[in-house]
């Protein structure tokens, strides 16, 4: 058995997702963390923020050329939208076979990149070195809708609520705990980037209405689906059970999942399956941790896939 190790760098390591990635890498037997780039923490030791990492590795403030000069096997870009391109260009020029996993939305509409939602797109992976990690809401939406794709009579209507960690670490109304207290904050109620992302991936128009809540982590996504033929609840449940059979990170529940029960867990739960009278409308609920299955855990699945390692290595399940 090949037990070679691979070198990895993380760009954007200070954020919530970067912190979760570092925990997963610390538990990985075949990944060596070669560098972590963070402008705000440059010069600080990684072990001071992540005790699971012992040693002298320090955060560095690396531009695209400096990242490329490191010559690592793989790079995870955990940057805000719009910042990935210079890093991708520099890595391609310096070492074209570098595996790049990008967590932003920058390449989710680029067909030359593998769109990595393994439970749904694993069959499309054929050695691509560039992997676009799906959005957190987009992951939940697709898991809730995909098993019923051929039954849809119209656009899925998806009401989403996320914890405020989804708004990142840069201060804004959407992560201001005082403004969020006892509140639910709607935003980007049409044309959200995840609405466009899911519409492209599923090949059907999706209507998505996101909200931010006062809890820190976790997404609940309620999908209202009109069907083109009458279904029983048993038929609906069977579709989901068959779709996610053998997928350790996807749990199909009879009851509607709670976001409080998924926080800190690496998988997703799908359930509820409530049929309206007449059998041609069903409501499905999906939950996941936006920092884990919605970001870091999925990135680790994709990285493992690209490096030829068992997909769930270092992921508790």
UniProtKB/Swiss-Prot annotation:
The keyword Transferase is assigned to this record: no
Record-level GO cellular component terms: cytoplasm
SUPFAM superfamilies named among the record's database cross-references: Glyceraldehyde-3-phosphate dehydrogenase-like, C-terminal domain, NAD(P)-binding Rossmann-fold domains
Enzyme nomenclature, EC number: 1.2.1.38
Catalytic reaction list: N-acetyl-L-glutamate 5-semialdehyde + phosphate + NADP(+) = N-acetyl-L-glutamyl 5-phosphate + NADPH + H(+)
PROSITE patterns attached to this UniProt entry: ARGC
An example Gene Ontology biological process: L-arginine biosynthetic process
Catalytic residue list: 136
A GO MF label: NADP+ binding
Record keywords: Amino-acid biosynthesis, Arginine biosynthesis, Cytoplasm, NADP, Oxidoreductase
Subcellular location: Cytoplasm
Lineage: superkingdom: Bacteria
Pathway: Amino-acid biosynthesis; L-arginine biosynthesis; N(2)-acetyl-L-ornithine from L-glutamate: step 3/4
First-listed, main subcellular location of the protein, grouped into a coarse class: cytoplasm
InterPro entries, alphabetized: AGPR_AS (IPR023013), AGPR_type-1 (IPR000706), NAD(P)-bd_dom_sf (IPR036291), NAGSA_dehydrogenase (IPR050085), Semialdehyde_DH_NAD-bd (IPR000534)
Acyltransferase is among the record's keywords: no
Family listed: Belongs to the NAGSA dehydrogenase family. Type 1 subfamily.
NCBIfam families (UniProt xref): argC (TIGR01850)
Protein function: Catalyzes the NADPH-dependent reduction of N-acetyl-5-glutamyl phosphate to yield N-acetyl-L-glutamate 5-semialdehyde.
Protein name: N-acetyl-gamma-glutamyl-phosphate reductase
């Amino acid at each position: 058995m090949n037990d070679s190790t691979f070198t990895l760098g993380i760009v954007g390591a200070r954020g919530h997702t970067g912190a979760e990635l570092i925990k997963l890498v610390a538990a990985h037997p075949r990944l060596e963390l070669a560098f972590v780039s963070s402008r705000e923490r440059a010069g600080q030791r990684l072990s001071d923020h992540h005790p699971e990492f012992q040693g002298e590795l320090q955060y560095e403030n690396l531009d695209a050329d400096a990242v490329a000069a490191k010559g690592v096997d793989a790079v995870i870009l955990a940057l805000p939208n719009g910042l990935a391109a210079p890093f991708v260009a520099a890595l391609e020029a310096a070492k074209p076979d570098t595996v790049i996993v990008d967590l932003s939305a920058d390449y989710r509409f680029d067909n030359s990149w593998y769109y990595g939602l393994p439970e749904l797109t694993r069959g499309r992976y054929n050695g691509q070195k560039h992997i676009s990690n799906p959005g957190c809401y987009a992951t939940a939406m697709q898991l809730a809708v995909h098993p019923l794709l051929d039954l849809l009579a119209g656009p899925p209507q998806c009401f989403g609520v996320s914890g405020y960690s989804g708004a990142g670490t840069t201060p804004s109304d959407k992560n201001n705990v005082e403004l969020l207290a006892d509140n639910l904050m709607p935003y980007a109620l049409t044309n959200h980037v995840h609405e466009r992302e899911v519409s492209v991936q599923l090949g059907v128009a999706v209507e998505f209405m996101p909200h931010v809540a006062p809890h820190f982590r976790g997404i609940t996504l309620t999908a209202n689906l009109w069907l083109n033929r009458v279904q029983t609840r048993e038929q609906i449940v069977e579709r989901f059970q068959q779709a996610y059979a053998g997928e350790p990170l996807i749990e199909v529940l009879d009851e509607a999942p709670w976001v409080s029960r998924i926080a800190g867990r690496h998988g997703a739960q799908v359930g509820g399956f409530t049929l309206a009278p007449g059998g041609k409308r069903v409501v499905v609920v999906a939950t996941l941790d936006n920092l884990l299955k919605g970001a870091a855990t999925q990135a680790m699945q994709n990285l493992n896939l690209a490096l030829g390692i068992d997909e769930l290595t270092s992921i508790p399940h």
